[in-house]
A protein has these predicted regions:
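Juxtamembrane intracellular "pre-TM" segments in multi-pass secondary transporters
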Residues: 2-4, 192-228, 252, 423-426
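Extracytoplasmic gate region of multi-pass secondary transporters
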Residues: 29-30, 221-276, 338, 342
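Helix-breaking motifs and short loop linkers at transmembrane-helix boundaries and internal kinks
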Residues: 41, 73, 94-100, 128, ...
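Conserved MFS/SLC helix-loop-helix module at the cytosolic interface between two early adjacent transmembrane helices
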Residues: 60-96
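Structural signature of the two symmetry-related core transmembrane helices
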Residues: 76-90, 294-311
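Cytoplasmic helix-loop-helix junction between adjacent transmembrane helices
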Residues: 104-143
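Helix-loop-helix hairpin linking two adjacent transmembrane segments in secondary transporters
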Residues: 139-189
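A late C-terminal transmembrane helix in Major Facilitator Superfamily
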Residues: 346-383
Length: 432
């Protein structure tokens, strides 16, 4: 029987791999963007609609799925999610009608919706507060490493299999990973039951457990709206880059498919570094005495403002090397915000409400994210460049930083159902 430490490491590994495959699949359409437009005669606006179909479905699936994840648990929710989205991904390579492809993107969005709320729930079960930042940083690095390896890897698949074969193959990879997840992963409750052990007391207490309430009650809390509005800027900027960054380098700077692939990969590598830095920085700040929520709040605001600044500079820069450097810095900072936003989820609500709260946050983020591809496509078609699109993104990110600053506060004390010491500590504390 594996030790608790080995299962913690296995949890991080599984969630990391699932995150990588998740982002490979959602990146596939942006990588095949130009090829599909030429092959099927799809306009930039139609492509924007197709790209946004995923994020709209993803966003509106969040609210009902959050409470369901809290009831089903991360193992069943995440495994079922993998199967549904992998089937949708594989089927995308088998159809040609614009409406059929939009429908499959909708199914992909529904299938992927439970992934990160489920991951946040799994981390909240396996990791204590003072070690959760680093764990979250490593898991959320997958949201950048997936897009980082996507351009060269998916381009390689396209060269040898065509864009249709690329979609089928990536779908099959997801189904294999789903089988491994069901075969090997155990929740902490399952592990404790099988080993007959009692869960050790956390060295730093978690938010106290609360009576089960409807997820809609979370909308009455100020912090819910802070996370909802704040995450809008994070996902708007991420989704603009995820869906249009390859097209930007091809259209604005005349890079071919191979050069574009490597440049985009470099930008996402910087994003992955940002998520790991965010996790380690938050844990280090807490170890030095900063309040848990304060450490998260500082990092998420810093990331949004840094991302906004460098994106704004890109809008007025024409040199390709300078644009690559600036976009790498943008991805570094905005992914600091992305990882930290999920650490906030695990900080201000107890474990049994993590998926519900995280789903509401994701709903807000992907409402904005669903607008980004369409608005960017419209802006490019009307102006002939990406400058306006980048300026809009910078403004949205800056507004979200203000929302985090103004609305995110230490949560009100709740009656603890555990020990009184845990409750007192939790009041003081209250993380892709």
């Amino acid at each position: 029987m594996r030790t608790i430490k080995s299962y913690k490491n296995l949890t991080i590994l599984f969630l990391f791999l699932i995150g990588v495959v998740n982002y490979l699949d959602r990146s596939a359409l942006s990588i095949a963007n130009t090829s599909i437009q030429k092959d099927l005669g799809i306009s930039p606006i139609q492509m924007g609609v197709m790209l946004s179909a995923f994020s709209i479905a993803y966003a509106f699936s969040q609210l009902p799925l959050g409470a369901l994840i809290d009831r089903l648990g991360s193992k069943l929710a995440l495994g079922g999610s993998l199967i549904v989205w992998s089937l949708a991904q594989a089927a995308f390579g088998l159809f040609s009608s614009f409406h059929q492809l939009v429908a499959l993107r909708v199914l992909l969005g529904i299938g992927e919706a439970p992934v990160f709320p489920s991951a946040a729930k799994a981390l909240s079960e396996w990791f204590d507060t003072q070690e959760r930042g680093t764990a979250t940083g490593w898991v959320w690095s997958s949201t950048c490493l997936g897009p980082c390896i996507a351009p060269p890897l998916l381009t390689l698949f396209m060269v040898h299999l065509g864009w249709r074969g690329m979609f089928v193959l990536t779908g099959v990879i997801g189904l294999v990973l789903a089988a491994c997840w069901f075969a090997f992963y155990k929740s902490k409750a399952q592990y404790m039951a099988q080993t007959g052990r009692e869960e050790p007391a956390p060295t730093q207490a978690r938010p106290p457990a609360t009576p089960r309430v409807r997820w809609t009650a979370l909308f009455k809390e100020r912090n819910t709206w802070g996370a909802f509005l704040g995450f809008m800027g994070v996902i708007y900027m991420i989704w603009l880059n995820l869906t249009w960054l390859p097209g930007y380098f091809e259209r604005e700077h005349g890079l071919d498919l191979y050069r574009t692939a490597w440049v985009v990969s470099l930008a996402y590598l910087f994003g992955a570094i940002g998520t790991v830095v965010a996790g380690k920085a938050c844990d280090r700040l807490v170890a030095r005495g900063m309040r848990v929520l304060a450490s998260r709040k500082m990092m998420v605001i810093m990331g949004l403002l840094g991302g906004a600044l460098f994106t704004l500079i890109v809008a007025f820069t024409t040199n390709v090397v300078a644009c690559v450097v600036l976009l790498c810095l943008t991805m570094f900072f905005i992914n600091i915000s992305s990882a930290t936003a999920w650490m906030i989820v695990n900080t201000i609500v107890p474990s049994e409400r993590v998926a519900s709260f995280g789903s509401i946050q994701n709903f807000g983020g992907y409402l904005a994210g669903s607008i980004a591809p369409i608005l960017t496509g419209f802006s490019v078609q009307q102006t002939g460049s990406f400058s306006s699109a980048f300026m809009i993104s910078a403004v949205v990110a800056a507004c979200s930083a203000v929302a985090y600053f103004a609305l995110l506060k230490e949560p009100a004390p709740r009656p603890a159902t555990t020990s009184s010491a845990d409750g007192a500590q939790a009041v003081g504390q209250a993380s892709h």
